[in-house]
Amino acid sequence: LADFEGMPRLFRDGNLESGMCMMPECAASNLGVFNSVRDFAAAGVDYVSEIFWPWLSWGENCSQWWLAPGKYDFPKIEARLQKIIEANPNAKILVRCKMNVPQWWLKQYPGELGTSAEGKNSVQPSLASDRWLVDCSQMLYDVTRHLENSRYARNIAGYVIAGGETSEWFWWGWSEGKFDYSQVAVNAFRQWLSRKYSTDKKLQEAWNDPKVT
């Protein structure tokens, strides 16, 4: 970013760019992505935001590539990147990596799900889950390290860390009740209270309630 005529503008290699970005339809196949990227390239749009899903199979999206702890179907991810670059050799790709977990993880850690006030579980872990954060952070590190050492790195402009419902970090289940009342969320809230107030007395004074601890 640099100032240009009194406004912050995007430059790349010294050249002014609009920063306009396209995103293929979420359930598109590799061919569908190719066609969309090609058409936008013809209109002068080189930035491409593409979603890489560890969890949700939706149409022919690029998903189900997180196979086990530390194991990934990198050829599936690379095939999607390859189609983008074939459609536009000048593509500047924003890799949107979803911080979701696959079914094998959900089966292994059912206690990490969010829970509504009515007792309904979310379909993905609570954002307060330390187990989710540690495992997804490792996945993100593994994927970015692999891509940065691949031949696709020169076309990757950046990474978008997407989480929660629809990538905007809404809590899972937010539209279906009051979340999050899971034990992991309760534990996280208690830890936050301890850090913020340090003693019961300070908490009681701040909340104007002599009964809270």
Language-model region placement:
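Polysaccharide-binding and catalytic clefts of secreted carbohydrate-active enzymes
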Residues: 106-213
